[in-house]
């Protein structure tokens, strides 16, 4: 028996064990255990179905090879073997995909955070441009985008944008966008035609619930203040703006987009939880990195992952040495799959 067949046999054995356990009186009476085992069985159900089919094909191949010695049935066996070998190959491809460890966050909604970095006003303008590209991509995927918070600069760009993106598989598609995005282009205000380089950071934070991230209220410092408008002018006569700081990590979130202090506090707390969860993910990825052949990226905001060179119409994805000369088309159409699909394929290949 091949190594793959042995692995699949052990998965089937475990699936059958779980079926027996889930019908036992001891487990049925224990809600926690029942939920835990049901979740485990559900996670291997798809691979179990494929495993049964694959092992059945292997058995049929073995039987037909034996029939090759039979003069009357050899021709029929040869034809059958051709079909079976194709089935075997197709199943092996599908099974390899199913054996790739699932990211537990892949089905989650996300908080997308874009911040202007080096480059002044031009960085802020690119925050808006990249956010529009993400919105177009979300539209193509039938996702819903809700701006949670935004801070504009004086030239129509943004210091920061935070948005909640909801839909099927949002995190699985956008998780590799985290990091530093560098843009090279001639600003509209540049009379000499010189190319400016600026950078923005992107953070991708899974939306989490209270069970996944528990915060001790005593670890929070909550401050309220009056919301300020553009240029710092006061736009609210009540203390509706909120700043929440998580003291153990010094992670801070400010929110003033809503007129209600309660709503601002609720939004700030949700983003704070997402940032704390993101921090947990980063720490886990760093701990697991040595067990992987290579990482697509740590998700660290300081890691320069991509360059957008407008004069050359070039998009360079540094983590996988991918270069595309269709930058403007990608940004205008929002078809980020040209970059995202190769990143996902590369990440999956590290588990093969």
Swiss-Prot record:
Xref: SUPFAM superfamilies: Release factor
Bilayer-spanning residue ranges: none
Pfam families: PCRF (PF03462), RF-1 (PF00472)
InterPro entries for the chain: PCRF, Pep_chain_release_fac_I, Pep_chain_release_fac_I_sf, Prokaryotic/Mito_RF, RF-1
N5-methylglutamine found at: 233
Region (Disordered): 288-309
Key word Protein biosynthesis present: yes
Annotated localization: Cytoplasm
GO molecular function: translation release factor activity, codon specific
Database matches in SMART domains: PCRF
UniProtKB keywords: Cytoplasm, Methylation, Protein biosynthesis
Primary site of residence: cytoplasm
PANTHER family: LD18447P
Family recorded in the similarity comment: Belongs to the prokaryotic/mitochondrial release factor family.
Described function: Peptide chain release factor 1 directs the termination of translation in response to the peptide chain termination codons UAG and UAA.
Full protein name: Peptide chain release factor 1
Gene source species: Helicobacter pylori (strain ATCC 700392 / 26695) (Campylobacter pylori)
Gene: prfA
